[in-house]
Amino acid sequence: MSLFLKDDSIQIREVWNDNLQEEMDLIRDVVDDFPYVAMDTEFPGIVVRPVGTFKSNADYHYETLKTNVNILKMIQLGLTFSNEQGNLPTCGTDKYCIWQFNFREFDLDSDIFALDSIELLKQSGIDLAKNTLDGIDSKRFAELLMSSGIVLNENVHWVTFHSGYDFGYLLKLLTCQNLPDSQTDFFKLINVYFPTVYDIKHLMKFCNSLHGGLNKLAELLEVERVGICHQAGSDSLLTSCTFRKLKENFFVGPLHKYSGVLYGLGVENGQVAI
């Protein structure tokens, strides 16, 4: 499969509460053959900043992440599956399949949010009213995700970009609890639910000429976007293709020694970085 995908070769499968079971059944069928899972979330922004004294920037970043994830709700999750060669599943169709999960819990009328973030999501085509009406029940999704084979599985490689918040929202959903107080405990949960994680923003540290966010990196690597920016399905596909191009161009051999690190957080393999 070429990294230069065309819009008409991709099907972004919109998942709502009424088709959640059948789409999760498809995912269960593809994960063994396509064990690289690129992930992106959309959420209502960052609404609070902690005050006080912190030992490090990483401690401050985690406290900010924890506080916001605990009071906010995920709006959308995108998943793109691929294999070692970068091929995507077709699920018996003539198109490559990407999944976009739409959640119901966020309420524009009663929940706190960052106005600029919500306006950006609206401009990107996310219909918050439809999410409220037809969106997925998070607890039901968590139950299906737990039995899907994509979490708690060391053979699955999670691929992300600057993904502390993405994993924060998924952990909150999977555990039905607020995030732990300490980074060390947070990473213990990461290691249980997502044993193999690659954060592209961390990998970029080892590629001297690369910088910027996901869109800038994709542009530098000549990876074209399919779909709409700031929608989780399209962003997860761009993450997947960018990871593949980065791996091919800058790394030789397995990447395992780079796994388990989330950019901006000061914990590696459960140990707080000094």
UniProtKB/Swiss-Prot annotation:
Pfam family, one: CAF1
Protein name: Probable CCR4-associated factor 1 homolog 6
Binding, a divalent metal cation: D40, E42, D166, D235
Catalyzed reactions per annotation: Exonucleolytic cleavage of poly(A) to 5'-AMP
Enzyme kind, highest EC tier: hydrolase
Keyword match Membrane: no
Keywords: Cytoplasm, Exonuclease, Hydrolase, Metal-binding, Nuclease, Nucleus, RNA-binding, Transcription, Transcription regulation
Major location category of this protein: nucleus
SUPFAM superfamilies, A to Z: Ribonuclease H-like
Family: Belongs to the CAF1 family.
Compartments (UniProt record): Nucleus; Cytoplasm
Source organism of the structure: Arabidopsis thaliana (Mouse-ear cress)
A Gene Ontology term for the protein's cellular component: nucleus
Assembly and oligomerization: Component of the CCR4-NOT complex, at least composed of CRR4 and CAF1 proteins.
